[in-house]
Swiss-Prot record:
Propeptide: 1-56
Catalytic reaction(s) noted: Cleavage of peptide bonds with very broad specificity
Name this protein carries in UniProt: Proteasome subunit beta 1
Gene: prcB1
Described purpose of this protein according to its UniProt entry: Component of the proteasome core, a large protease complex with broad specificity involved in protein degradation.
Pfam families the UniProt entry points to: Proteasome
Subunit text: The 20S proteasome core is composed of 14 alpha and 14 beta subunits that assemble into four stacked heptameric rings, resulting in a barrel-shaped structure. The two inner rings, each composed of seven catalytic beta subunits, are sandwiched by two outer rings, each composed of seven alpha subunits. The catalytic chamber with the active sites is on the inside of the barrel. Has a gated structure, the ends of the cylinder being occluded by the N-termini of the alpha-subunits. Is capped by the proteasome-associated ATPase, ARC.
Natural source organism: Thermomonospora curvata (strain ATCC 19995 / DSM 43183 / JCM 3096 / KCTC 9072 / NBRC 15933 / NCIMB 10081 / Henssen B9)
Keyword field contains Cytoplasm: yes
Residue numbers annotated as active site: 57 (nucleophile)
Single GO cellular component term: cytoplasm
Keyword annotations of the record: Autocatalytic cleavage, Cytoplasm, Hydrolase, Protease, Proteasome, Threonine protease, Zymogen
Length: 284
């Protein structure tokens, strides 16, 4: 039988009670089944039978004097198959931050959407913006809540980056499946191709990068990852599928247009014709 509130059009009482500024905590107490991963059947062996959940793969982030650049390849895999060629893994978290996912794509994207609402809900409840470190801590709590699904093989791990308006620098935060939060310096990468991307980042990063050069470094690193990791997709000039690249500076979040990223991709691909291994670092 429907409640009296449904007849009058009023919000349920839970929405009218003063409480936490965390939307995730509110949802957990009011309707926990709506939290990421809760609707999936809890199975000791993970996914049933031979079902393969699509996985997002490689993400990179690079700091530069004016902020931070984050980029992700476009491939999602299911086992040894390419599940999608143009999936997006880098998202705007709020005006001064970006979040990207690697791992189980479905759960990761649910976490991103909930995180976006979490930040907006805090600002509406408290009347002020959450600090960059506060956002990073909120995301860690959300990842920790998914630990049960992670232990069954449905792991989703984000990379969070943004412009710290107090320190006036770009910052990068990584996470483990248990919700541990770690600040990374200069650059970082997560996902199946991260070991190859990190090698490229170490060789190409320098402290005086411009925003455009930092974006180019990200595309170079993703190309190296795709070169050695079959789950990472490189720039597809035929289909015009390029990495998603975003910058976060004092002016806010900006996703680079397809044309701009396409030009960076062509620079990388053209350079590989002469030097297949990519740019080399000086020995001295």
């Amino acid at each position: 039988m429907a409640s009296h509130d449904s007849y009058t059009g009023r919000l349920p009482g839970a929405f009218m009670n003063p409480g936490t500024s965390s939307f995730t905590e509110f949802l957990a107490s009011y309707n926990p089944d709506l939290l990421p991963g809760r609707h999936m059947t809890a199975l000791a062996g993970g996914m049933p039978g031979n079902v393969e959940a699509p996985h997002a793969t490689t993400i990179v982030a690079v700091t530069f004097p004016g902020g931070v650049v984050m980029a992700g390849d476009r491939r999602a895999t299911a086992g040894n198959m390419i599940a999608q060629r143009d999936v997006e893994k880098v998202f705007r978290a709020d005006e001064f931050s970006a979040v990207a996912i690697a791992g189980t794509a479905g759960i990761g994207m649910e976490i991103v959407r909930l995180f976006q609402v979490e930040i907006e809900h805090y600002e509406k409840m408290e009347g002020r913006t959450l600090s960059l470190e506060g956002k990073a801590n909120r995301l860690a709590t959300m990842i920790r809540a998914n630990l049960g699904m992670a232990m069954q093989g449905l792991v989703a791990v984000p990379l969070f980056a943004g412009y710290d308006t107090e320190r006036e620098v770009g910052r990068i935060f990584s996470y483990d499946p248990a919700g541990g939060r770690y600040e990374e310096h200069e650059h970082h990468s997560i996902g199946s191709g991260s070991v190859f991307a990190r090698g490229a980042l170490k060789k190409l990063w320098r402290p005086d990068l411009s925003a455009q050069d930092a974006a180019l470094v990200c595309v170079q690193a993703l190309y190296d990852a795709a070169d050695d990791d079959s789950a990472t997709g490189g720039p597809d000039l035929i289909r015009k599928i390029y990495p998603v690249v975003a910058t976060v500076t004092a002016d806010g979040f900006r996703r680079l247009p397809e044309e701009e990223v396409g030009e960076l991709a062509r620079i990388v691909v053209d350079g590989r014709h002469d030097s297949p291994g990519g740019p080399t670092a000086p020995l001295r």
